[in-house]
Each structure stands twice: as C-alpha cells, then as structure tokens.
C-alpha cells in the first residue's frame, strides 16, 4: 500500500481519531449539509451528510453537490444507505499539519478528516465517498451499476443526433479536456452509471 493509502486496524484508527478529534470543534460552529451524489430518484445515487466546522467546506459542497435537505430522508429510505463525512480544520495552524489525517471506514461508510483545509481532503464526498460508491457497485450491485473515474459527454452529430461518450482514465490524463470537447457536458471526473429499467 502506498504512503498515500495506508491501512490500519479499525481499533487503532479509532483511537487516533478520538485522540485528535476530541474537542476539535470547541468554540466553533458545527454545520451539517445534506447532499446527494447523483440525481434525486436515480438508483445509483448516494445520499451523503457532510459535518464540518469550516464554512469553506460547506459553501463549496453547496456549489459542487446536490443539496437535498427536503429529499434526504426519502432518498435514504428508498436506497437503504447514506455516507457520513466528518471534518474539522482544527486550529488551522501550520504546526498541526503532522497531525492531519483522513480516514475512510469502509464498513461504516464514514470518512473522518481533521487538521487539514485542502479541498481534496475536506470535501469528502468526492474521494472518500467514491471509494464507498465503488464498493457498493462492485459488491452489492454487480452487473447493475458502475462507479468509476470517468468522463461523460455528448457530441452532437448530423440531424441533432447525440452520441454519448464515456471514458475512463487516471488523474492527469485528459478526462476534463475530452469531456469539454462535447456539446452536452455531463461530468469530467467521477461517474455513477446504472442500467435503467427499460434496458
């Protein structure tokens, strides 16, 4: 496992989380956002809660994800799960960076992030929740859904015909550039796909 993706025993991880997160939001405002990774009503969508003491994180989440406060409970009831994301920037001091951590608990569909402010490690619905979405597609919805690092775009042809394209590639290989070449841009990074009832 790379230094960016370490693995440890759950009990050891929880001890680290308790040690470093206990009281981390003291004197701060804890905010909670209710989001959906995908369209309301779609079988491959994933409801997610983001809990943070950072206005930057919640404001960014409101821009990047579907805020579904009114639809959250019905979606959870229908889909049978939701992802939980807990973050705090702590005191936001350079000396706390060695204590920064991001944990993913795949069994409990929960991510923890603390002592960091970088969007990739605080907007947990992207990286952390994508891991959970992949697990769900692979282990629970095999042959029904896919969660992948893909772009989706549509290119208009003669007579208004739209040819939909989907492409997978690792980071830094041109997904965004490829997706933006289309006339009907859907997404450039993470894709949730499913087979509709009509095939």
Residue ranges and their predicted role:
Residues 178:
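Hydrophobic positions on the alpha1 helix immediately C-terminal to the Walker A/P-loop
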Residues 1-173, 183-194, 199:
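Conserved internal helical-beta-strand scaffold that buttresses enzyme catalytic cores
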